Amino acid sequence: MKLLLFGYGNVGKAFRKLLHEKRSPELNDVIIGGIVTRRGIMLQDKEDFTPDLEGDVFKAFEKIKPDIIVDVSSANYNNGEPSLSLYKEAIKDGVNIITTNKAPLALAFNEIFSLARSKGVKIGFQGTVMSGTPSINLYRVLPGSRVIKIRGILNGTTNFILTLMNKGVSFEEALKEAQRRGYAEEDPTLDINGFDAAAKITILANFMIGNSVTIKDVKFEGINRDLPKNEKIKLIAYADEKEVWVKPLPISQDDPLYNVDGVENALEITTDIQSILIRGPGAGPVNAAYGALSDLILLKRDCL
């Protein structure tokens, strides 16, 4: 079974490493047929990227003819490209997809999955929400239950900043510390303004509740220096059948999300049967890569 790896940054390199290290029986026949980045196309599987051909991901798709696309490329929230068009082309050819790229799903979840169902194509996307912590794949093992609402802390950067602010650190100093530790980007806008969490709750709302929403339908607020100082604040993402939103809210000590601190993420899923809480690391290249690898194994087991 041949993979086309789209993207070879930290997540792509971590995925390749895990694929070689975690040789479960399901992975014995899996090979990386090629890797494509902005620099070109490598038609082999090796640690150091050296392009063999010029060209983009569409040329790589045509040349390599993969069985599965693994998309670990960076997100383009303007229009989801080139991943969105790549997914459509892959689905039409019956090629399965594994992705850690939130943008196409946040912009066109139902369009993508409707097309995939019509062609019998499987899509694994655990790495888009909470990385390797099985938020998406937890839902796959809840057959027969109906999700009524979901709420959670879905952005590790803002949760780390809010944890420090709760200890009396200023917003500016907390952000600097997050950047120093590598939790926040040099430009942290998409984390700080709530957009990243909004993209994730969009994916969850469509997948778990059956909503028909895009990131453009979600109301979101971020965090700033003006948040109340005398209460513990968390950036909460919420969805039910009627609304999807993200905003900072005070949280009480008896709330299951109260002690979710640092870069940890958590998701509370309320069904018509029970309420389930899952928590764990929500970021980091190895965690995201493991999310993709777990999807690959589940795909091989015919469990996606």
From Swiss-Prot:
- Binding sites annotated in the UniProt record for NADP(+): 8, 10-11, 38-39, 73, 100, 102, 182, 185, 284
Say which enzyme class the record assigns.
oxidoreductase
Q: What is its EC number?
A: 1.1.1.3
Keyword Disulfide bond included in the entry's annotation: yes
Cofactor list? a metal cation
Single GO biological process annotation from the record: methionine biosynthetic process
Q: Which Pfam families match?
A: Homoserine_dh, NAD_binding_3
Q: Where is the active site?
A: 200 (proton donor)
What does the entry comment about cofactor binding? A sodium ion is seen in the structure; a metal ion may subtly affect the relative position of the nucleotide-binding region to influence enzyme activity, and could increase the stability of the enzyme.
Q: Which InterPro entries match?
A: Asp/hSer_DH_NAD-bd, HDH_cat, HDH_CS, HDH_short, NAD(P)-bd_dom_sf
Q: How is its activity regulated?
A: Inhibited by cysteine.
Keywords recorded for this protein, A-Z: Amino-acid biosynthesis, Disulfide bond, Metal-binding, Methionine biosynthesis, NAD, NADP, Nucleotide-binding, Oxidoreductase, Sodium, Threonine biosynthesis
Reaction(s) the record says it catalyses: L-homoserine + NADP(+) = L-aspartate 4-semialdehyde + NADPH + H(+); L-homoserine + NAD(+) = L-aspartate 4-semialdehyde + NADH + H(+)
| Gene Ontology molecular functions | homoserine dehydrogenase activity; metal ion binding; NADP binding
Instruction: Describe PTMs of this protein.
Output: The enzyme is activated by reductive cleavage of the interchain disulfide bond between the two subunits.
User: Which residues does Na(+) bind?
Assistant: 129, 133
Q: Subunit details for this protein?
A: Homodimer.
Family that this chain belongs to: Belongs to the homoserine dehydrogenase family.
The record, for PANTHER family, names: HOMOSERINE DEHYDROGENASE
User: What is the protein's name according to its record?
Assistant: Homoserine dehydrogenase
What is the scientific name of the source organism? Sulfurisphaera tokodaii (strain DSM 16993 / JCM 10545 / NBRC 100140 / 7) (Sulfolobus tokodaii)
